[in-house]
Amino acid sequence: MQTVTLSIFRFNEFEKRLWVLGQMTANKLGMHYLPKAKFWKMFGSGTGQGFTPKPNWHVWSILAVWPDEETARREVAESPIYQRWTKMADESYTVLLQPTSAWGKWDGKEPFEPVKPASDVRPIAALTRATVKFWKAERFWAREPAISHMIGRNKDVVFKIGVGEVPFVQQVTFSIWPDARSMEEFARGAGGPHGEAIKAVRAENWFKEELYARFQILGTIGKWEGKDPVGEALTARPSEAPKPAPAPAAAQPAPAAEAPKPAPAPVAEKPALAVEMPKPAEPPKPVVEAPKPASAPVASKPMPQGGKPNFKGKPGKGGRKENA
């Protein structure tokens, strides 16, 4: 999955700053090459909050697009360009990013391949790149002081830097925020200097080319100003795992409570069968009635007629007495 790295380097000594200026010149002449990178750029930076036309000769950066995170980490650690810059710099810091959205072009290309995240991204990184029309540059930079003042006071912003390929006209801003809401409030807040600048850009068509991208943060390498500001934000971000935890806890008791309910039903059916089982024992009633037919032969009335003994022994005697 595509991975983007933004590496920033600080060169405190004058000789080191001269060295990095030579590196930038060599890059412009095509003497540098990153074979594994799909797209890459070298930048200078601005003073103050970073979003100014006045250069900061101490801070320089490299942005590169790699096929995957493994390649990105390996190249940042082993590529000759990165090794030279890291060795010469007093401080270096790399943020590894995964594009989640992108719109626009950079030098006529679409360098980022966004992948929609599975969940809300926190923290979130935003990058804007624009080529300002030369005759609009003065009006563009006139908006800068108010924007720098606003972002400098914003407690939500985790990290920010302004860099550029060509002074005054090719600018890149990079910032990291706790979430999309805080970023949107700064960028498009009603009446805010940044929101007003966006309106002016659209109304007066300041840009020759522009690109906007958002990223999920994969990790960091190194330190900046003696700490890892982005790594700290990743550690301190609102944990999304505990929120789902209460749901399963509430859901599990429900099935557990319903499970015993089927159990009483079978228990109730068994006694019913046990009660009905004795009913077939009613056949003893015919046993009681059996003697009744036996009493019928005892009360036999045909005996006075002579019965079978008189009929065989003395047939006429008994008959005559009956008639007399």
Swiss-Prot record:
The record, for InterPro entries, names:
CrtA-like
Report the GO molecular function annotations: metal ion binding; spheroidene monooxygenase activity
The segment annotated Disordered runs over 226-324
Entry EC no(s): 1.14.15.9
* CC cofactor note: Binds 1 heme per subunit.
Q: Between which residues do disulfide bridges form?
A: none
What superkingdom does the record give? Bacteria
What chemistry does it catalyse, as a reaction equation? spheroidene + 4 reduced [2Fe-2S]-[ferredoxin] + 2 O2 + 4 H(+) = spheroiden-2-one + 4 oxidized [2Fe-2S]-[ferredoxin] + 3 H2O; spheroidene + 2 reduced [2Fe-2S]-[ferredoxin] + O2 + 2 H(+) = 2-hydroxyspheroidene + 2 oxidized [2Fe-2S]-[ferredoxin] + H2O; 2-hydroxyspheroidene + 2 reduced [2Fe-2S]-[ferredoxin] + O2 + 2 H(+) = 2,2-dihydroxyspheroidene + 2 oxidized [2Fe-2S]-[ferredoxin] + H2O; 2,2-dihydroxyspheroidene = spheroiden-2-one + H2O
Name the chain's protein: Spheroidene monooxygenase
Q: What is the lineage of its organism?
A: Bacteria, Pseudomonadati, Pseudomonadota, Alphaproteobacteria, Rhodobacterales
Gene that encodes it: crtA
